[in-house]
Amino acid sequence: MDIDVVVLQSLDKFIEFSEPDEFSIIRDFGQPQRYFNSSVMKWNNDFATEMIWEEYQKNLEHYKTLQGDQNVITDAMNLHGKKILKPYPDEWTFSYKWTHRKKPKFGEASRTYEVVDDASIAVFHGKPNPHESTQDWVKDNWK
């Protein structure tokens, strides 16, 4: 889990969600059908290392052309990991900036900075960061 997330509820369901031989990750907020967001992930090194790290090392020049770890992970999962991929339910996380995952990217997402009911994690991708927020719910939960 990234350090720039705000935990609002217990994380137990994230731990219990997938089996040891599955890779769990949240879907991207801007292009959820195409990419993953690496802010919240869970995997077992016994099998995921080969699919991500060893794949990255083997095809380093290709992966250097991609922007950021999220794109590397998405590419590696699309290449090797579909059978073990189990994305977390969208309603468990939300973007601080965009209330709903929308397609196309930067659709008519509102910027109300409100908590999404029943979500456990608010993801701060890009700017602002949690310590820059003026919302009380962020200040109360960012520790």
In which residue ranges do the predicted regions lie?
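GT-A fold catalytic core of metal-dependent nucleotide-sugar glycosyltransferases
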Residues: 1-35, 42-43
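Residue-level preference for the first positions of well-ordered beta-strands
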Residues: 23, 40, 119-121
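Short, glycine/charged-enriched secondary-structure capping and boundary segments
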Residues: 14-16, 38-40, 56, 136-138
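Residues that flank catalytic or metal-binding motifs in active/ligand-binding sites
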Residues: 1, 36-39, 69, 117-118
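A glycosyltransferase accessory/donor-loop signature
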Residues: 45-143
